[in-house]
A protein has these predicted regions:
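Intrinsically disordered, low-complexity, positively biased terminal segments
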Residues: 1-191
Length: 191
């Protein structure tokens, strides 16, 4: 029962909003514009609903900067609450799907729930993945932290700084940094 509005500039789509109307509020679940001007125009559009709804809720990724486009910061309340949860159920399969070519790495994964995920995963220069039991590794990581790396929630540098990963071969840090980069996470889960 929601609405999707697509915004155009010179017959090209430049942004969209997905919103749901409730009794007293309007909830924006997806909000994307390609430039500052587009985002400001979209906010102006949403403000027209203020006449009919007492509350406007905009859901955005945790590290989103959307709130800085709102001119009246005093009238705004920002709550950050991550509402997405992911779980790697098969580490070897997940690594194979990523096509990690160009590096020779040995990543030790620790999973306290799924025993099959424990081990050292060797990635060769061609992107082939093989699981080894007990060999020296370049990096040790818990499966939950690996999940955050793979989805781009944290960069490799941030994981090292936060001590969420153990680096056993410092010569491999630059390779790891190239493989695991921070990205915007656009996965949305609705309750």
């Amino acid at each position: 029962n929601g609405d999707i509005y697509i915004f155009y500039l010179e017959n090209r789509p430049v942004g969209y909003i997905s919103l749901y109307r409730r009794e007293e509020s309007i909830e924006v679940r997806e909000f994307f514009g390609i430039s500052r001007g587009v985002v400001e125009s979209m906010y102006a559009f949403i403000k027209t609903y203020r006449e009919y709804y007492s509350e406007l809720i905009i859901k955005a990724p945790v590290k989103s900067k959307l709130n800085f486009y709102i001119h009246n910061q005093v009238a705004m309340k920002k709550n950050e609450s991550p509402f997405i949860m992911g779980r790697i159920t098969n580490v070897e399969s997940m690594l194979k799907r990523l096509h990690l070519k160009g590096s020779n790495l040995k990543i030790s994964v620790i999973d306290k729930i799924i025993e099959e995920n424990n081990g050292v995963f060797e990635i060769d220069i061609n992107g082939n993945i093989s699981k080894k039991d007990k060999i020296e590794n370049d990096m040790e990581i818990d499966v939950s932290e690996l999940n955050q790396l793979l989805f781009g929630y944290f960069s490799m540098n941030e994981m090292i700084e936060l001590e969420r990963v153990k680096i056993n071969n410092t010569e491999k840090i630059s390779e790891l940094e190239k493989l695991f980069v921070k990205k915007k996470v656009y996965i949305q889960e609705y309750q």
